[in-house]
Structures are given as C-alpha cells and as structure tokens.
C-alpha cells in the first residue's frame, strides 16, 4: 500500500511538471508546426524566445499582479490579451482559446496563438524576454546541431 501511495505521488509530480522540451526537440517541433520563417521570424528566434520565457516548459505560468493577468505555457502567452482563464478582468481573448490549452504537452494550440500574437503590429517584440535576450543577438546557437 505504501508503495502505491509513493508511486501515485511520483506520477502526480510528473503530471504537474508538464513537458520540458529539449532544445533540438523543440526546434524540430516548431519547424513541423510552421514557425520557421513565419512572418519573417527565424526558427532560432522562436527557440530563443521559448528558452527565456519558459525554459522550454509547457506548464510554466507567471502571475502579473499589476493587471491581474497570468502568462501561460511555453511562450508565456498572456491572459489579458490572448487567452481566457476566466479570472483576468477585461480580458480580450484574441486567440479565442482557453489559457489551459496553452499548458498542454502538445504545443500546437500554443503555436497557433503565438502566430496570432506576431500578426499584431508589435510582432515578436510583444515578448519582453525576446527583446531582452534575443533581439539583435546571434541566436543561431539555439538551433545549432539540431539538423533543422
């Protein structure tokens, strides 16, 4: 019985953690989902963005007390503008998606929403982490050795 409880706790901790992509695994997945060159944004820039926003973690969340919004998933997509979490005051939900969908191990919905984000005038500059860590830098290291 004790072993069953311990196994249950281990499985629960794995479930809560979500998927943490390896760098090259993410690069291949993003390429397959059509992000390489989308709106002129290189695959390396997308991988750099994911590194600095979530450390490649699909379950990453970050609460923003200023506007009571939360950032979700591998790209840290914000509930004030892009998704619906049922809690953020004045939310727009421009991606027309539940924020929980952005926390799935299958990142297809997150990629679709990220494509919507970059169609806005700010483009990829909407992400502070991209501006701080990727913009005007050599980001080729993020796809180096990945065969993409």
Swiss-Prot record:
Disulfide bonds: 24-146, 48-134, 83-99, 95-113
Occurrences of domain C-type lysozyme (ranges): 19-148
Additional observations: Lysozyme C is capable of both hydrolysis and transglycosylation; it also shows a slight esterase activity. It acts rapidly on both peptide-substituted and unsubstituted peptidoglycan, and slowly on chitin oligosaccharides.
Protein name: Lysozyme C
Function field: Lysozymes have primarily a bacteriolytic function; those in tissues and body fluids are associated with the monocyte-macrophage system and enhance the activity of immunoagents.
Entry-linked InterPro entries: Glyco_hydro_22, Glyco_hydro_22_CS, Glyco_hydro_22_lys, Lysozyme-like_dom_sf
Keywords: Antimicrobial, Bacteriolytic enzyme, Disulfide bond, Glycosidase, Hydrolase, Signal
Originating species: Allenopithecus nigroviridis (Allen's swamp monkey)
Catalytic residues (UniProt): 53, 71
Catalysis: reaction(s): Hydrolysis of (1->4)-beta-linkages between N-acetylmuramic acid and N-acetyl-D-glucosamine residues in a peptidoglycan and between N-acetyl-D-glucosamine residues in chitodextrins
Any one GO BP annotation for this protein: killing of cells of another organism
Pfam families, alphabetized: Lys
Keyword Transmembrane helix: no
Keyword Secreted attributed: no
Matches recorded under Gene3D superfamilies: 1.10.530.10
GO molecular function term, any single one: lysozyme activity
């Amino acid at each position: 019985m004790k072993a069953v409880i311990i196994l249950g706790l281990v499985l629960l901790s794995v479930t809560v953690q979500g998927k943490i992509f390896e760098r090259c695994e993410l690069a291949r997945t993003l390429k397959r989902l059509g992000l390489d060159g989308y709106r002129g944004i290189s695959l390396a820039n997308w991988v750099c963005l994911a590194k600095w926003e979530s450390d490649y973690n699909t379950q990453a969340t970050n609460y923003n007390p200023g506007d009571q919004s939360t950032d979700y998933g591998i790209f840290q997509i914000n509930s004030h503008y892009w998704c619906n979490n049922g809690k953020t005051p004045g939310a727009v939900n421009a991606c027309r998606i539940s924020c929980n969908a952005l926390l799935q191990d299958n990142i297809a919905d997150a990629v679709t929403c990220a494509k919507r984000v970059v169609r806005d005038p700010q483009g990829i500059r909407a992400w502070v982490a991209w501006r701080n860590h990727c913009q005007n830098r050599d980001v080729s290291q993020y796809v180096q050795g990945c065969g993409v």
